[in-house]
């Protein structure tokens, strides 16, 4: 799990199902096997390979960030969430996911699926887009983030929110944390 491969997959998976991303990811990696290849590519080449995934700002930001990584870091990913989050199209959660999965850095994540999971698990009132609610969710995400097996935890918590704790019709009987879920208890 290199930072580059994790980064590209995380960006592709934003607002897009895994089943859709798989083929695109492989074609992208075949054309741009590393950050240097992506940075050297023409923007039109990048957008062409993105055709069908939608949300083209993701592809443009990916390309810009690749160039920034090569120009400022020699093609290496920075070591801190704060530095990674300065790259175009990467926020705190995506930066955390990249570093946790590729380098084992202890960094909480809070994508849409994790927000939903934590909101339900702790019956956090309010809309997650409001700053006080988001701050509370970050606190919870920080508390749950373990000290070991960061890649496994990060993938598991995202998958739990994406597959069981879904927006519509969550599968509570199959959920491993259902016994502690305050939303289910209500």
Residue spans for each PLM region:
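Catalytic cores of DNA base-excision repair glycosylases
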Residues: 1-185
